[in-house]
């Protein structure tokens, strides 16, 4: 979940699972699995907690992540402002045995790139009965994966997990008393990459 302030905002317990496999039957094909849980807590459901599990495998690399989200809402007459925190652990590893090594003396092969890093994120979410908007950064701690290897002035010396910023906004249209349409926009900003814009209809 990219917006920690959203946990528990739906007013009921939610469990979501997603599994995605690309290029089936191809060795080293990307595989992604996510499982998330969130629920409202507190006397007036003004708080929420969530738990997310994430695994991603591509070729010789694997990434495992577990995060906990907490949200606290301030209720107004016609709206609600929610602040969210995210904390967790991320594990990144490379299995060089799955590669065809041309040079056993390659310094990159001799380097243990396996890393366990903390994650910490923030989010703000504002919503009414008609519209909502929010901003978040799921992880504000940058990770340099090859910082301990003396390979300056190479492409590997710049391999890092940079901070991702997300902006979201949406509006609720009542088509009938029982049917609602929720078009939304999600913007993703990362330093050094083009701005990404997604339109979502719910």
List where the protein language model places each region.
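Subset of outer-membrane beta-barrel
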Residues: 1-201
């Amino acid at each position: 979940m990219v917006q920690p302030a959203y946990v528990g905002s739906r007013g009921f317990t939610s469990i979501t699972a997603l599994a995605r496999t690309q290029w089936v039957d191809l060795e080293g094909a990307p595989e992604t699995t996510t499982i998330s849980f969130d629920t409202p807590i507190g006397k007036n459901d003004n708080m929420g907690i969530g738990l997310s599990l994430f695994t991603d495998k591509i070729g010789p690399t694997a990434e495992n992540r577990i995060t906990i989200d907490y949200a606290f809402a301030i209720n107004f007459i016609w709206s609600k402002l929610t602040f969210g925190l995210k904390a967790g652990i991320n594990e990144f590893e490379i299995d060089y045995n799955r590669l065809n090594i041309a040079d056993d003396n390659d310094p990159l092969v001799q380097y243990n790139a396996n890393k366990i890093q903390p994650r910490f994120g923030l989010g703000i979410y504002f919503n009414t009965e008609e519209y909502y908007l929010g901003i978040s950064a799921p992880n504000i701690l940058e990770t340099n994966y090859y910082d301990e290897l003396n390979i300056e002035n190479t492409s590997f010396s710049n391999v890092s997990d940079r901070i991702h910023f997300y902006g979201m906004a949406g509006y609720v249209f009542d088509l009938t008393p029982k049917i609602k349409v929720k078009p939304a926009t999600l913007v993703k900003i990362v330093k050094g990459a083009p701005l990404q814009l997604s339109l979502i209809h719910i």
